[in-house]
Swiss-Prot record:
<dbReference type="InterPro" id="IPR036312">
    <property type="entry name" value="Bifun_inhib/LTP/seed_sf"/>
</dbReference>
<keyword id="KW-1015">Disulfide bond</keyword>
<protein>
    <recommendedName>
        <fullName>Non-specific lipid-transfer protein 4</fullName>
    </recommendedName>
</protein>
<feature type="signal peptide">
    <location>
        <begin position="1"/>
        <end position="23"/>
    </location>
</feature>
<keyword id="KW-0446">Lipid-binding</keyword>
<dbReference type="InterPro" id="IPR016140">
    <property type="entry name" value="Bifunc_inhib/LTP/seed_store"/>
</dbReference>
<keyword id="KW-0732">Signal</keyword>
<dbReference type="GO" id="GO:0009414">
    <property type="term" value="P:response to water deprivation"/>
</dbReference>
<keyword id="KW-0813">Transport</keyword>
<dbReference type="InterPro" id="IPR000528">
    <property type="entry name" value="Plant_nsLTP"/>
</dbReference>
<feature type="disulfide bond">
    <location>
        <begin position="52"/>
        <end position="94"/>
    </location>
</feature>
<comment type="function">
    <text>Plant non-specific lipid-transfer proteins transfer phospholipids as well as galactolipids across membranes. May play a role in wax or cutin deposition in the cell walls of expanding epidermal cells and certain secretory tissues.</text>
</comment>
<dbReference type="GO" id="GO:0006869">
    <property type="term" value="P:lipid transport"/>
</dbReference>
<dbReference type="Pfam" id="PF00234">
    <property type="entry name" value="Tryp_alpha_amyl"/>
</dbReference>
<comment type="similarity">
    <text>Belongs to the plant LTP family.</text>
</comment>
<dbReference type="GO" id="GO:0009737">
    <property type="term" value="P:response to abscisic acid"/>
</dbReference>
<feature type="disulfide bond">
    <location>
        <begin position="37"/>
        <end position="51"/>
    </location>
</feature>
Length: 112
């Protein structure tokens, strides 16, 4: 639990550093949409329904190239503190297809 709280605190601080001017999506939006996923992303198990609701909401909001790139940057920052395989598989577990892998090696600038 302490790890999850520490991770979430670091992620929220990153929100203010990474925000992009062109994108309507902020890292704060990403963080609030995916906060129900923290337990799953750190320990695994069953994906909670509120987590999938957040994944679907975020996917629906990322409709422009700047929004998708910003969401990628936010997810990439968050992926550093969670289990990488759980993070990359989360969209599929929620029935969502995204056009890029969630990985610290993804080049978010190439996302269209």
């Amino acid at each position: 639990m302490a790890f999850a709280l520490r991770f979430f605190t670091c992620f929220v601080l990153t929100v203010f550093i990474v925000a992009s001017v062109d994108a309507a999506i902020t890292c704060g939006t990403v963080a609030s949409s995916l906060s129900p996923c923290l337990g799953y992303l750190s320990k695994g198990g069953v994906v909670p329904p509120p987590c999938c609701a957040g994944v679907k909401k975020l996917n629906g909001m990322a409709q422009t190239t700047p929004d998708r790139q910003q969401a990628c940057r936010c997810l990439q920052s968050a992926a550093k503190g969670v289990n990488p395989s759980l993070a990359s598989g989360l969209p599929g577990k929620c029935g969502v297809s995204i056009p890029y892998p969630i990985s610290t090696s993804t080049n978010c600038a190439t996302i269209k």
